[in-house]
């Protein structure tokens, strides 16, 4: 069985290494075909290989002009600023058709708890994550889709130096994705995909658990 890192690698191959593929540009309220994977390609219902070109957003105020646009967990200002960036990119005529959406740990970490980098999950608060999934991440995903952008949602933070099936970080990812994948606004969404783990480095050899079906 494939572990979570192998699945992620295969997704990256399908997403980033598409050669001789059809262009698919975005515009507001465009019809977006459901994509599926064939080998290392994303393919539309007619069998055309689709090449995605896009950009990333992370919803931390520090990473967005060093906190000059919003702070103190201001949801309204965060949405206004980041939706405005999408509008500006589309209005400029950039040939984009997907958004990599980081569910930044700024929102899900307990305030005031010191962490050692983005791979430190000691401050992760599941209730905060659920709250801001509904208030920040899903609204941003839906807004992007409304502009004709496919969305790839990535988990809060990045992988530690080593990850193995059954370890603390693996259990953290399972908890996050179990909730996200079962959310009624995300489950089976035709235009939203999941990046199971970010910046994985070394995976320890271990037996893999059976894959889950959501």
Where are these regions (language model features)?
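Bacterial N-terminal signal peptides that target proteins for export
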Residues: 1-12
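Boundary at the C-terminal end of the N-terminal hydrophobic targeting segment
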Residues: 24-26
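Cysteine-centered motifs
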Residues: 16-17
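N-terminal signal peptide c-region/cleavage motif recognized by signal peptidases
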Residues: 20-21
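Active-site mouth of glycoside hydrolases
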Residues: 29-214
């Amino acid at each position: 069985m494939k572990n979570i890192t192998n699945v992620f690698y295969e997704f990256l191959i399908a997403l980033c290494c598409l050669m001789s593929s059809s262009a698919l540009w975005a515009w507001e309220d465009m019809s977006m075909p459901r994509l599926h994977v064939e080998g290392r390609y994303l393919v539309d219902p007619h069998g055309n290989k689709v090449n995605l070109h896009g950009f990333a957003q992370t919803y931390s105020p520090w990473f967005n002009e060093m906190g000059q646009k919003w702070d103190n967990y201001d949801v309204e200002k965060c949405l206004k600023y980041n939706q405005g960036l999408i509008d500006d990119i589309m209005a400029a005529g950039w040939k984009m058709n997907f958004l990599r959406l980081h569910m930044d740990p700024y929102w899900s970490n307990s305030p005031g708890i010191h962490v050692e980098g983005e791979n430190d999950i000691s401050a992760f608060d599941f209730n905060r994550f659920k709250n801001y999934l509904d208030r920040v991440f899903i609204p941003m995903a839906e807004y992007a889709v409304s502009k004709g952008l496919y969305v790839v949602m990535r988990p809060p933070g990045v992988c530690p130096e080593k990850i193995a099936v059954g370890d603390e970080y693996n259990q953290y990812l399972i908890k996050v994705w179990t909730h996200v994948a079962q959310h009624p606004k995300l489950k089976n969404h035709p235009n939203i995909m999941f990046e199971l783990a970010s910046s994985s480095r070394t995976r320890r050899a271990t037996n893999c658990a059976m894959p889950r079906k959501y």
